[in-house]
Every structure is written in C-alpha cells, then in structure tokens.
Amino acid sequence: LLERMALLDIDCIGLDWTIDMADGRRRINSVQEKAVQGNVDPVVLFASEDAVEDAVRTVCKKAGPKGHVLNLGHGVLVGAPEEKVKHFFDVSKTIKYD
C-alpha cells in the first residue's frame, strides 16, 4: 500500500506507529521521494520521560535529516499526561543532525 500511496500527487505521507519508520521511508522512496510524518507510538506518553525521549530519538534517527515531520503515529490519546506531551515537544526541539 505504501508503494501505491507514493504514486499519488501529494508531498507527505503519514505513517502510524505500526510501521517501522526506516522501512516505511525506504518503501515510499523506492517509488518516489516523499516526506513522511509520524510515527511515535502514542502509548509512549503513558510511559516514563526516558521512554518518551528514546522513542522520539529513535523515530528521528530512522527517518533521517530531511523530509520528516515528527508526530505521534495517531494523535494524543485521551488521558495522556500533559507533562509527557510537553516532554515530547521539549525533546523534539533538541534533535540535531550532523
């Protein structure tokens, strides 16, 4: 399905948390280069701050330095602690690429 989506006249494809970011990007870009959005598992917001940081850094590393919109793979789930949502954004602001 990702390969077919890559043929559409769109700039960015959102990936949910069930798709490995590196694999999704590889499959999409094997057809046509597109930006990708996602795909941190939204359940991580119920885990520790260390788990949130690890998830954000892992997704960013797999996505690479160009053409990635960091986001949750679904959205903020009801009941997610606001301090974890804030931490998600705080960590995202520290991401640097060499």
For each predicted feature, which ranges?
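Active-site loop segments of alpha/beta catalytic cores
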Residues: L1-D98
